[in-house]
Amino acid sequence: MKHEVLIAGGGPTGMMLAGELTLAGVDVAIIERRASQELVGSRAGGLHSRTIEVLDQRGIADRFLVEGQKAQVTGFAGVHFDLSGFPTRHPYSLGLRQKHIERILAGWVDELKVPIYRGIEVTGFAQDDTGVDVELSEGCSLRAHYLVGCDGGRSRVRKAAGIAFPGSDPTTSNLIAEAELAETPPEWGIRRDALGIHALGRVEYEIRNGEIFYADHGPVGVLVT
């Protein structure tokens, strides 16, 4: 089977690109290793103003806004910033877990009738003057004019293409987990000590007047730096 563009990776980046190309009249398909769009764990936790502006341009921002939590305050290095005066129609960030972001985007690309080849991975590819043959984990292949790697920071497509990923060494590392706690901690929020910065908070929460109110029950998000 042949497409104009094949996208390796059906996460937020891959689905958004597929939607944009489809709206431009391009025959595009997604190759996604997961059998469904279900996502285990928290991963990303929200959207920023510019992202919401782009979603608004496509007429789908309200799908995210109705499910998320708006916050007009953000923080950096312990300093809080008021976003209410930002020159945008959306002067806030939106708290919304990636599993919900992906579900909403998947519904959008489904409406656009973007084909998604699920449960398979790109294992390699061979280019020529007219396109690229994409090898798949099932032992078959697909043909396209272009292959786009939207398969994450450890992108197999990027590595196979020999594309460098320059940058500086990390100065900190983070561990993120979801846990069921036997006892409720005395205090939610961010802690700082000699070992670094740590945070505890329920995965489900509400934002009211710039303050976070955590759910009484459910898994706890843990961040350790």
Model-identified regions with their sequence ranges:
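Core Rossmann-like FAD-binding/catalytic domain of the broad FAD-dependent monooxygenase superfamily
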Residues: M1-T225
